[in-house]
Amino acid sequence: MVASSYVRSRLFIFPSCLSAICLGIAPVQAMTFDLGNPDFRLDWDTTVKYTGGVRLHERDHRLADSPNRDEGDYRVDRGDMIMNRADVLTQIDLTYQQIHGVRLSAAGWYDFGFDRNVEQNPELRSQGWQSSYENDRYSGLVQRYYKGPSGEILDAFAFGSMEVGDTPVNLRFGQHTVYWGTSVYDHYSNSIAYGQSPLDARKSAMVPGSTAQEVFLPVPQFSLQSQVTPELSLAGVYQLDWKPTRFSEGGTYFAGTDYLFAGPDRRPLSPGVSIPRLDPLEPDHKYGSFGLSASWTPEFLDGELAAYYRRFDDPMPWLAPQSVKGGYRLVYPEDIDLFGLSLNRSLGDASLGVELSMRHDAPLNALGVSIADNEGPRGDTLHMLVNMIGALPKTSLYSSGTWTAELSYSRLLDVTAHEELYRGEDDGCAPLGLDADDGCSTRDFVGATLQVTPQWLQVLPGVNLALPTNVRYGIHGNGATSASGQEDTYTLSIGLQADIHERVTTALTYVTTYAPYSRVTNGVATSGRDGFSTRDRDWIAFSIQTSF
């Protein structure tokens, strides 16, 4: 039995693409220990990485002059370091006859240059505007995850295999990750795997090349997979706990809104006046999310056709906080149903993945959350994606290379609850005079991601070079669900990577994001497509890592 905490072979493509940087990772050089018994094996893998980042873009004062967006923008000046960070990831596998075993992995980090003091626009401070943090110092949560030194346990699970009659059943119990479907990039918005695991978006933004093991946060759960016949396999998962997705915290460099999410202490409303952030409203029972899947691999198909059903509590909140007596808080939706189909097969020399899914009572893009029932807008939505992975055509310009393309589509079928709170251009936005240019959702959304990575082998003895280039673009419309993509927004990254003797990987990567703003009042941008408040945060990252 393979001890991997992932269940789709195509997953190898996107660990680094979580942050749209898409750097490759050198093969891990594992240490294997002789335990004196051939039935037992102990493998220990450790990766150490350094990342330095520098801001390249001047502040756009139409953004930095906003009292709710200035702290992230004033975090560093152009030419200053965003981070000066060391990370370590270590993993131990103890197996018995390569069938049963346990896995334990952990991550640690420290940023040598992180300043605990919150920066504000000096003009706003002089007017009496408070920062989003008490005493103008980052909270303990922010200091733990951004400064350190700190760490956490990731995987901690046991695995094994047994036979029920003549049918083999593979089991895993403990803290691990399960990921279904064929998505490569659009895993957190339009895929079958949406909400199946919380994500560490903080780390994916801060650390280029973060692996899936670091970014997909494992949760305590029980999962199984059984090969019922040579052509049919069944799988199931039951979660024993719930964890929220981690976002870039307000007031840090990659955050667009100062008073969100779990880090800030308060929300400034006017000079000298702020309201406190309250504890989030999380699911009543942090257990019970489950899923079932069946995979069929008939010979004539030359691939895999799979069906899925999941019922889950969302690790992502409605992104508009709820205003309640005494403060504001985030609210996490419960009881979402997802039905899906996927196809994974070869098509010529390329690999093809297709997904079609429908969500019932899915949380929608919100203007707010009702205080009557602690619910935001919900609806039924349709999602589809198609992706292909292949090798670049042979040419004298490079030695080899790969390309990956993914097209995503979503459609709002119906608003089933709190239509007045739905941030749709014909719904809650209409009375406010807002439209799609202000980030209001449309019925349909189309987006695409393309990555091209040419490689040059043995440019020096033992040295291979690669030039990963990745662009993600919103082609049409604004998605109806949270963070599902918006028209005319993009993320572009261009990197130069060197793999040295398959032991050391270095990379230099430029990253830029763009979203248009639509309204400027008194010199301050007040509205636009989602992501407009970080459009002036271009940066360049240098990283070096080794594994042993």
Residue ranges and their predicted role:
Residues 50-56, 108-112, 175-179, 238-244, ...:
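Transmembrane beta-strands of outer-membrane beta-barrel pores
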Residues 98-258, 476, 485-490, 511-515:
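Outer membrane beta-barrel
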Residues 40, 70-72, 80-88, 149-154, ...:
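Residues that define the transmembrane beta-barrel architecture of outer-membrane proteins
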Residues 46, 86-94, 104, 155-160, ...:
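Residues on the lipid-exposed face of transmembrane beta-strands in outer-membrane beta-barrel proteins
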Residues 30-44, 57-59, 93-102, 115, ...:
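Short loop/turn motifs that connect adjacent beta-strands in outer-membrane beta-barrel proteins
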Residues 42-50, 100-106, 169-173, 233-236, ...:
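Transmembrane beta-strands of outer-membrane beta-barrel proteins
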